[in-house]
Amino acid sequence: MLSKILSSATYGIDAYLVEVETHVEKQIPGFIIVGLPDSAVKESRERVTAAIKNSGFEYPLKKITVNLAPADIKKEGSSFDLPIAIGLLTATGLIESNKLVDTVFLGELSLDGKLRPVKGALPITVEAKKKGIKRIILPVASSVEASIVDEIDVYGVTKLDEVVDFLNGTNELVPIKSDRREIFLRVNKYHLDFSDVKGQENVKRALEVAAAGAHNIIMIGPPGSGKTMLAKRLPTILPPLTFDEALETTKIHSIAGILSRDTALITERPFRSPHHTVSDAALVGGGSFPRPGEVSFAHHGVLFLDELPEFKKNVLEVLRQPLEDSRVTVSRSKLSLEFPANFMLAAAMNPCPCGYFTDPNKECTCTPPLIQKYMAKISGPLLDRIDIHIEVPAVKYKELATEAPAEKSGIIRDRVIKARDIQLNRFKEYKHIFNNADMGSKEVRKYCKLDTSGEELLKMAMTKLGLSARAYDRILKVSRTIADIDNSENVLPQHVSEAIQYRSLDRELWKH
């Protein structure tokens, strides 16, 4: 007897439907799975056999053939256990085939018939809805993320016999639903705040400008000056995630299996801070069957690289593509997958190996060649993609001891949102430009025009401060963002003057 049942698998951050065909015939007992299964799928035979027996159902001593279609795409993971078991029970007559119409099954079985959570429940549910599927049955531990998708019934189950009873009408299950409005009411309730940081007003201002224009930023300063503390609070001043952004971010975390079981939707901007020993595959994604990396986990959020020169050079170089394209392409011999990676880069570094090159209170013990070698670890092409460089001085005792309240993240965020709204309106006719950092040379010439005073100021700065040619466009972009924060239609000399301050690493001081 033959049964056909629907399941699904992930491909990149999306999913595709898989038809599980089960054929049972009177021949020498055996269990074969075809359709390019990986080792985890092949092992389903043992899990399904034990789960059926331990759930109290009769296991057929016949030849069983399972085909996973389409057969030309490799299937991986243990999520096919439940559909294979249901298909087998249907083929042997324990479940009526008409009960399986417009239903997707998903879940890993333990040997006693209980269901374990699976990766990718959210993108699979989204794909099922697109294809007109009416319901999805999956482990209760994976049902919370799936329940955010509307217009499809999501049933969370705990064991195999519960699914069989539900399909046969002897057990009632209630679809799980999540309230999007309730979830988004909790948005922006961060436990960190910029008001926690004493002093460093210039650095806070630079971070506000970076957030307002989506500019990448690097902070240079001695140990203990607060670089990491400031970077961790950067997401608190970014605009709230839209529903589409939250959905895309959650899908990435879902397929990687790092989404919390009680999280229906990620509503806070991600903040990822990989250690400097991270490999290039872990940073941008990789593996024999490609998986997303840290740059994708930081999608619509912040990627923070602390101690930037300590990262391996090849690791830093692979950052160039995602910084330029906001996407990562991972190619293998038989497939090529694309993962979104639209993040803000925030980096921090000491000015030299000992850390005290720019500290007026402590003597630097590094020789000039040592400092030059240390700085050379960051390539020009990577630095070229970072718009704002800001020096972070050591905090003075007077600032640490002050009782005066500092500005809260919410107030800064309101200014950032207003500046972003101006940019969205400015670039509404462009498909791939949403903020000032996205501008190319053509857009910079159009939207960042300077008056005579501004031109003279920039020319003098380029000459006297020894700024590089690549700093020119960066200064104009940042000037435009500062003007947007001030709600100024024109880029004024004071905006240019402030932007010039944010090119620390282009100065002659760092080149010798």
Give the predicted meaning of each segment:
Residues 171-209, 213, 240-295:
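P-loop NTPase nucleotide-binding/switch module
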Residues 300, 306-307, 318:
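Walker B catalytic acidic pair
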Residues 1-218, 222-225, 266, 331, ...:
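Peripheral, non-AAA+ core regions of ATP-driven protein-machinery
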Residues 111, 303-304, 310-311:
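Residues immediately C-terminal
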Residues 221, 285, 307:
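The Walker A (P-loop) glycine that initiates the GxxxxGKT/S ATP-binding motif of P-loop NTPases
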Residues 34, 40-45, 58-60, 67-77, ...:
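Basic, amphipathic alpha-helical bundle interface domains used for macromolecular binding and assembly
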Residues 219-260, 325:
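Walker A/P-loop
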